[in-house]
A protein has these predicted regions:
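NTP-handling and nucleic-acid-processing catalytic cores
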Residues: 1-176
């Protein structure tokens, strides 16, 4: 293959441009962009809880009294295979986050969610008896420590402009 590529280069037939030239191997012709069809791919999506290492600090950040239940920040991802490599959970500094309590799968749970995604997330995970405890900007949670969901190690909460409320929970799992 390399000798064949060398001959193409020597003949001056290899050009560097801004767009690829798509070819049909069946017909031996170039294809226009309008002739290219992409296969739809459905990716799995999951919600994963990152429990607060210091749950009291989580309640202090929201200036509210602690309540019963596991407390943490859930993330939503369409790339679950990257979770083992997770190094942080990102929030947006200026988004409003709510601290809510309720029951998930029969367990009292306290979650941090972007306000704009509250209804969508609680519906998706089947949270019952949702009570809003407090709200705060994401910036108050910077540097908080969360437990990695699979490994015996902590990950920090960081701030990122890439975090949006288009889908998910308002928290983005971050892996290299």
């Amino acid at each position: 293959m390399i000798p064949a590529l060398a001959r193409i280069i020597e003949a001056g037939n290899l050009l560097h441009g801004a767009k690829p030239v798509n070819c049909s191997f069946d017909f031996g012709t170039e294809l226009a962009e309008s002739e290219i069809e992409y296969r739809d791919k459905t990716s799995p999506s999951i919600d994963v809880m990152f429990a607060a290492v210091d749950r009291e600090a989580l309640f202090r950040a929201f200036a509210t009294e602690p309540v019963a239940g596991e407390a943490g920040i859930p993330i939503w991802t369409t790339t679950p295979w990257t979770l083992p490599a997770n190094e942080a959970v990102a929030l947006h500094a200026d988004l409003e986050y709510v601290l809510v309590s309720g029951e998930v799968a029969g367990q009292e749970t306290v979650l941090v969610l972007a306000r704009d995604l509250l209804a969508a997330v609680t519906d998706r995970i089947g949270m019952q008896g949702v009570t809003e405890l407090a709200s705060a900007p994401g910036s108050v949670l910077e540097h908080m420590r969360l437990s990695h969901p699979f490994y015996d190690r902590d990950v920090p909460v960081i701030l990122g402009e890439h975090v949006t409320v288009e889908a998910g929970t308002g928290a983005v799992h971050t892996a290299p």
